[in-house]
Amino acid sequence: MEYVHKSVLLKETIEHLNINPEGIYVDGTLGGGGHSEEILKRLTTGKLIAIDRDEEAILAAKERLKDYKNVIYIKDNFKNIKEILRNLGIEKVDGILLDLGVSSYQLEEVERGFSYMKDAPLDMRMDKTSPFSAYDVVNRYSEKELERVIREYGEEKWASRIAKFIVEERKKGDIKTTSQLVEIIKKAIPASARRTGPHPAKRTFQAIRIEVNEELKDLDRALEDMVEVLRGKGRIAVITFHSLEDRIVKNTFKKLENPCTCPPGLPCTCGKQPVIKIITKKPILPSKEEVEENPRSRSAKLRVAEKL
């Protein structure tokens, strides 16, 4: 299948990266290669390090970007940025981009099991070599663990009922497909609550996907590592798709911009100096036109910071 992925907030992201044609840039979430391609168009002697956990994403992007010789492809998790750069003998970079969440390609590729709209095996792994999948979460987690995941990562108010219904249902046999899970969720959520708002399974599927791929785990640490490897005046641009991710990015940036731990109103004695300047005081949102053209962009937010 061709890797189709509309890059979200493309123009805004590239503009805010302030690309230096001779600089070194990192795309930590290569995906379909849309953002990478725009960065490469602006480089002369510079280079791009393109990272993704998904082997298929890398293969598809290599095809798309085959005319560019200044790309280094790395199959890894962007959280290992320091180790990745160390292995390449690179100390500092001029800009980093992260486009978090699942790509439209992964959603479209039915057998990956990311979508609640199509029947597929319960999988949801971004890295297909990982031994842990959605099947394990749904069939092996205790009711309490399921409730925690669905409440915490899905912000789902019916989490306890959904967890209870999953555990009841699996007594009859393993839950193996996305459509089985969707039916259980529909039964768990009262009909009156299902009439309005998004698809009833949306939040639970998001929660399980985040758990399977550990999407929020160590994200704050990874952001701090990325800021550390930025050169002065280098920028980091992060696109998020739900409030949990956005909160982590916002709070990490705030902490790095104002790390002082002294009581307000007293002179600073802790010696902690600001590391970044936040460029986007409020997140940049997609235009009305972009949302109409690409509904997936509706919940996207872009935050940008510059290394001091």
Curated annotation (Swiss-Prot):
Pfam family membership, one: Methyltransf_5
One GO MF term attached to the UniProt entry: rRNA (cytosine-N4-)-methyltransferase activity
Compartments it resides in: Cytoplasm
Region annotation Disordered: where it falls in the sequence: 288-308
EC number: 2.1.1.199
Annotated TM spans: none
Cellular component terms per the entry's GO annotation: cytoplasm
Residues bound to S-adenosyl-L-methionine: 33-35, 52, 78, 99, 106
Classification via InterPro entries: RsmH, SAM-dep_MeTrfase_MraW_recog, SAM-dependent_MTases_sf
One GO-annotated biological process of the protein: rRNA base methylation
Catalysis: reaction(s): cytidine(1402) in 16S rRNA + S-adenosyl-L-methionine = N(4)-methylcytidine(1402) in 16S rRNA + S-adenosyl-L-homocysteine + H(+)
Keyword annotations of the record: Cytoplasm, Methyltransferase, rRNA processing, S-adenosyl-L-methionine, Transferase
SUPFAM superfamilies tied to this protein: Putative methyltransferase TM0872, insert domain, S-adenosyl-L-methionine-dependent methyltransferases
Function of the protein: Specifically methylates the N4 position of cytidine in position 1402 (C1402) of 16S rRNA.
PANTHER family: 12S RRNA N4-METHYLCYTIDINE METHYLTRANSFERASE, S-ADENOSYL-METHYLTRANSFERASE MRAW
UniProt similarity note: Belongs to the methyltransferase superfamily. RsmH family.
Name by which UniProt lists this protein: Ribosomal RNA small subunit methyltransferase H
Organism: Caldanaerobacter subterraneus subsp. tengcongensis (strain DSM 15242 / JCM 11007 / NBRC 100824 / MB4) (Thermoanaerobacter tengcongensis)
